[in-house]
Amino acid sequence: MKIFFEDYTYHLPIIQKSGLSQYFYISEKYDEAKLISVGYFYAPEIQDAVFVLPKIFLGLISTQKDKDGNYIEEPGPDNVHSWAVFGKYLPEGVYDLNDPKNPLLADSRLQTILQMSIWLYQSIRKFEQRNGKTEIISNQVNKIAKGVGRDCSATFIDIILSLLRFHKEHQNLFTYISIINSSGNNKIHWGKTISKVQPVIQDGAPFYAEFRNKNKIVNFDEEIIVLFYSVLEYLRQTYRFSVNPNVNYPLIPARKIQAMIDSGKGTRRLRSIRKKYFTDELVALWKLLYAFFEKAERIAAGRQREEALMVRNYNIVFEDMIDVLIGDVEYDTYRKLPDGKIIDHLYTDKSLTSEGQIYFIGDSKYYKREEDIEGTSVFKQYTYAKNIIQLNIDEILKRDPAGHIRYRDELTEGYDITPNFFIRGYVNPDNMNFTEPALRPMKNQFAPNRHFINRPFDRDSLVLCGFNINFLYVLSHYVLESGASSAKSILRGQLRKGIVGRVNEYYNFYKVYPSIPVELFIIKNRDAFRGQFFRPGDKADFIWFGFDKTDLNNTDSLLNLEDVQKVEKVSLQ
């Protein structure tokens, strides 16, 4: 197996001898090539699978050494640096997993990479299912293996995944067959024992030193199970798939499975026992095994064309993954803005200032580990928030405001705080797992966007947050969609908590309870506190006030206001 990484520049001969099609890389110089696609490719000329993995695994290392000959760990402005797998291995040194000197073979994280390769393949399949034909996917096969037979147009990986899925879903079937077929086989056949074995006579009674069991004819159920588990063991040894055939049957060695493939004996043997199976499960297993041997024999004989499931612009697939995780299809029409731009992720959740709902606006980012989000991306994200606010206000002006999200309070002329964020995939090389989202704030956050200082409730005062999320979790969740609704709720809650924390870092907030009717109090103070106060609801008995952290006199100014009954300094929750 060969493993390459997207967006990394390799020496061109390495790419060429791997059998990768020219469609999947670009030559920047005469002897260099950069991979521009992600996914799976089978190269018939080398009879091996090639996976191109996302650039998200690459981190910066220095290529300069200190006086003792060790690499300088931290890349700096004065030393040359390169992208490396886990920030440790140069990609051109670990691409060939058949090389016994490959340092990845001794790294415990290799199994995670191999598992991730299969998730990656399935994620592209899933994207294809959800979005139909798309120009970003290069796919020579259009049907997905589902256990049908030789007429299934499927890649070698499709067939292998179907075998692994069958193993996972039919454990009880194999145990049941083993018990049924074993019952009665060890009972003594006394007729055969008496006629075939010479007894020892002692005290006039015969004693038999050995016995004859009941006849056991060839059991085809067990034969196909032995072949199935032997193929799984072959896949484990040859392609490093994580599968442990835990059976009591003697298995066919992997070298003999390879010999069956090379000689064409696998399909011949399966054809000879085809009509011995009647249950749906064993018929399906026969079809899967036949598809496996037929494909493997074609490859061994050099009759297999190259096959690929590769995607350009994997960031589009990642965006779809995040939208499955946190998005809401109910608001897809709002995502498409009048200026032609499309918001990545849009959903509603509890407002930061009230029990009502507010739009959460997200943008997913797919970068290498050390690359920062800056420039145009930040500007566009602030623009998305402004557009959503305006679209919602336009809806209210056109129709009855009842039921619409309450962005603007007519009386204070203040605007609710708009949650706005980036969410970026990352891989922690020291904790690689598929089960934890590990959502955390980015190290480098973004300065608030505003027209006036000290006005958190002004329309143009916007806070933008950045979060990292475990890419492996996003990948596996996208493929499996296990516990989708609960995972979505938990993750949205974590995003909201992180945004609230960020807003609290910028502003001090107060709840002010007037001693006169709220409406009258607002009218009296509107000019003095425009953009600094906001009524959370038409029937609220208090008013939110907010000030920059640098404004140290706001508590006293509020206490000195006329008609104030109580002032509470609080943080948003």
What is the predicted role of each segment?
Residues 274-279, 302-321:
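A short, highly charged nucleic-acid-interacting micro-segment common to nuclease
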Residues 323-346, 396-398:
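A short acidic/basic microdomain associated with nuclease active sites
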Residues 337-341, 353-356, 376-379, 411-417, ...:
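A structural signal for short secondary-structure junctions
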Residues 43-50, 347-361:
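Active-site beta-strand-loop-beta-strand hairpin of nuclease catalytic cores
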Residues 343, 374, 388-438:
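Nucleic-acid nuclease catalytic cores
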Residues 1-265, 281-299, 303, 456-457, ...:
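Terminal, charged accessory segments of proteins
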